[in-house]
């Protein structure tokens, strides 16, 4: 039995300054916020959705969209029909379900359904219904504030495994990095592996200028979309994004050779993936295409080249833990390998938050991509992980934070 082919993603969404203004106004008016969505779904469905189980939320949304539509101002906020627009947005963009086109059109009076289709936010289907083409989620933080983040549909929304070109939304890893990053004002910041742009959005609250790099043109397109959509809260001029943000395509630090930054952040594609099949696709959203933990080693070793004096780098990483001479894998030293990547003269702090054995690591990342939905592919990939780790004598894999600082010439503690 051969693996089931994974359907490709639709084109990345796109906005003009004018359509970004229209969409932002519509989402704010719904209001498409975390609190409003939780109020619509209720605590049970909200918690279930947080656990990646959508059926309770689908039941609630279906109840709001049942029956004849009503899209006039007479429907108050407490009326069931007054929530149809919000329910349509939740159904399309948080659940990935088909919703009545008329309801979503009414929810977007400025952009309109035609504008949403043209922007790549929804695709039209049969029977007067539309389905979300992206995940568009409300996001709130103390800084910069209330926003909306677009990314590719999740495996739950797709109801199938993720394609290689997938662009992740805001997940636990990105929230971990955002929460750990020091927020002192800096002149120039760099986001390596920008993805949907969440770290860049945070950096703009305290950096004069941000450069964001990614190997994926699709990721850069999502980042541009999110910058345009949230320009008001970010303090950006939609017609002059380049005044404060530069989006650069390329591998790791290649697009910024010769430049210096006060702060570098990165949630790189650090996930270790067997490279036993040269024809296997590279999952650019999480796997840098190198063997083992080589992509993290390359990044850590090269970061001094882009750090200004007193500058700091903060990143998340995986590192392999060799079996060594001990029979107990849990006692093998975890930091010898990542410390060997740090250039002389750099100050380094390493924090290991988690450690997994080879089987546990394989299960975590195969489930993350929902490959269990394709049992033959899952079993083959699981065996590939075990063979790959065994071939290199890997006892475990560590996950954690790496903080680097280039000392200032005057011995001060740095800019960030």
Spans of model-derived segments:
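Conserved SAM-binding loop of SAM-dependent methyltransferases across substrates and taxa
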Residues: 196-207
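C-terminal lobe and adjacent flexible extensions of AdoMet/dcAdoMet transferase-like proteins
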Residues: 386-416
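S-adenosylmethionine
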Residues: 162-171, 183, 215-383, 388, ...
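Accessory substrate-recognition/RNA-binding modules or partner subunits associated with SAM-dependent
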Residues: 21, 26-130
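Non-catalytic substrate-recognition/targeting regions of SAM-dependent transferases
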Residues: 100-167
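Conserved class I S-adenosyl-L-methionine
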Residues: 186-195
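Conserved alpha-helix/loop element of class I SAM-dependent methyltransferases that forms part
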Residues: 171-187
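Conserved SAM-binding motif I beta-strand of class I
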Residues: 209-214
